[in-house]
């Protein structure tokens, strides 16, 4: 994550919103992901340095929350809920069909970089089989 002067200003303004700088970890991870498409090892280092933390502390947050991607994602990112209820309502079949159609596995990206897929947890399983795109 090579930082421009503008990026530094944005990151500093994010940090300044919080009484304790470490509270800015998640917003900074969101910012890094918005720049690079995913959270890179370099962005972990930059965030840790800006917050006076160990890289392991920032990495722990980035790996705990599933919204932070650790590798490249496609231009179109598709998530399919495969929790028990959604699986019963067709989530597994939908996911398997997508994998077969696209020729990729979970967290995979098509060769052209256009589409990536992943398992998600929708928390709305009682309502319908949940699929999300470009979140």
Locate predicted features.
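Conserved small/polar residues in nucleotide/adenosyl-binding loops
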Residues: 128-134
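Iron-sulfur (Fe-S) cluster-binding segments and ferredoxin-like electron-carrier domains
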Residues: 78, 85-101, 130
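Key DNA-contact positions within bacterial/archaeal DNA-binding proteins
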Residues: 56
């Amino acid at each position: 994550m090579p930082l421009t002067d503008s990026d530094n200003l944005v990151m500093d303004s994010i940090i300044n919103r919080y009484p304790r700088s470490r509270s800015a970890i998640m917003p900074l991870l969101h910012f890094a992901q918005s720049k690079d498409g995913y959270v890179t090892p370099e962005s972990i280092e930059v965030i840790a340095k800006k917050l006076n933390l160990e890289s392991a502390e920032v990495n722990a947050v980035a790996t705990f929350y599933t919204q932070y991607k650790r590798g490249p994602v496609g231009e179109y990112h598709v998530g399919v809920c495969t929790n028990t209820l959604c699986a019963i309502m067709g989530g597994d079949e939908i996911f398997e069909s997508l994998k077969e159609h696209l020729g990729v596995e979970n967290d995979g990206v098509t060769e052209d970089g256009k589409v990536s897929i992943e398992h998600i947890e929708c928390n709305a399983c009682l309502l319908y089989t949940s699929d999300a795109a470009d979140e």
